[in-house]
Amino acid sequence: MRFPEFNGEWEKKRISEFCTLLKGTGISKDQLSTNGNPCILYGELYTKYKAEIINEVLSCTELDANTLVKSKVNDVIIPCSGETAIDIATARYVPFDDVLLGGDLNILRSNKVNGSFLAYQLNGKRKYDIARVAQGVSVVHLYGEHLKNIVISLPVIEEQQKISRLLHLLDERIATQNKIIEDLKKLKSAI
């Protein structure tokens, strides 16, 4: 998919060439609270954050933020563990600073790529590459060391932004249509 104003080949680069790979720090489910600092736990990537872009952080903790890893706008997070290799290949874009990132999260931090574009690509064509490097049987693990050699295709930053905006608009449209379908199913079952 190309927009007419862009041309030229996309560059192929390993993640380690444009991202710093970090790991979150421990926040357990029982340390969540109704107040405090916004935080994201790895399990929430499977349950609360279904879209590539996290539009709102839904959890908080009162833990001391100075001892934990904080997000920076443009971070992409991927779980470090999961039940299957394909499940673990789940990337989410964090468009906020200072969100506390839980311990079982890989953090891809870059100011050279658009984070939402990266999340869409990691959940698309690269999902199977990520699943291939995950390790384990009953519990699958994935760490920065495994991610660093995944090859990503990158257009210029302006094209990354335009593509990710289009994909985000499509996600919003799909969510709206799904809500309409759910409402119609409820109406139908009430008759």
Regions found by a protein language model. Give the residues of each.
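Short, ligand-facing micro-motifs at secondary-structure edges
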Residues: 46-57, 76-101, 115-120, 128-132
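Sequence-specific dsDNA recognition surfaces
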Residues: 16-29, 43-73
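Hydrophobic structural patches
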Residues: 1-4, 162-174
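Short, well-ordered beta-strand elements within core beta-sheets of diverse protein domains
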Residues: 2, 62, 106-110, 149-154
